[in-house]
Amino acid sequence: MSWFKRKEKGITTATEDKMDVPKGLWYKSPTGKIIDAEELARNLWVSPEDDFHVRIGSAEYFHILFDNNEFTELDANMTSKDPLGFVDTKKYADRLVDVMQKTKLKDAVRTAVGKSKGRDLVICCMDFAFIGGSMGAVVGEKIARGIDHSIKNKIPFVMISKSGGARMMEAAYSLMQLAKTSAKLAQLAEAKIPYISLCTDPTTGGTTASYAMLGDINISEPGALIGFAGPRVVRDTTGKDLPEGFQTAEFVLEHGFLDFITPRKELKDKINLYLDLILNNEVR
């Protein structure tokens, strides 16, 4: 027995009138688990069935770490230039304009200061959506200024890395940022101000070779890709099969390059715990 009976046969709908399910309502994890997008956001963008940590950007990390999502962004309008007149498949200057329009970001890092569990904190967070989170002159300068703000105001510093490495379109200008940010972190250490480095998926290239591995405590989200050259490059170069889980956060932790792996739900509590322990403050 059917619940509904068609009164008229041969009814057709024009293609332009057909309605598809809107994009963004569902998310499918790499293991095939499907989750409602709103539920995913409530779960801090972590798939509840398989614990897969979805890549997120600075807006989401600021929401997670700052109290009531209240913060002041530093150097918000700083943008990259094209000193070399670089051209690959398109002009670098045009690429910058396009990606700024697409992502609504000014560059691949944002710096903000606000309260986390009631105490001041400076956070620099990278955005992979902006040219693969690549590190150019503006990224290095914003990180350096964020560190300066920490030193001047004696505020702990947190760096959230999510990057493919140096920005090839800026050549040596990009490579200079490795030395620049590392030197600034040395000044931060001399000032005895704590620095927590959070590696997220992916943390590779010059980012790994500089500030991402220089924290007083280096932590990572589960399953993050962490390395210098990516696994495909290593495999093609060496001609050898790679160990199981090569360059995952768990592999890197096992080999001593990380201190802890921290699930996203625990980030705010754990980061503040580490800072309290370093500063010998009462644990919040």
Curated annotation (Swiss-Prot):
Pathway: Lipid metabolism; malonyl-CoA biosynthesis; malonyl-CoA from acetyl-CoA: step 1/1. Keywords: ATP-binding, Cytoplasm, Fatty acid biosynthesis, Fatty acid metabolism, Lipid biosynthesis, Lipid metabolism, Nucleotide-binding, Transferase. Signal peptide: none annotated. The keyword Nucleotide-binding applies. It catalyses: N(6)-carboxybiotinyl-L-lysyl-[protein] + acetyl-CoA = N(6)-biotinyl-L-lysyl-[protein] + malonyl-CoA. Acetyl-CoA carboxylase is a heterohexamer composed of biotin carboxyl carrier protein (AccB), biotin carboxylase (AccC) and two subunits each of ACCase subunit alpha (AccA) and ACCase subunit beta (AccD). This is Acetyl-coenzyme A carboxylase carboxyl transferase subunit beta.
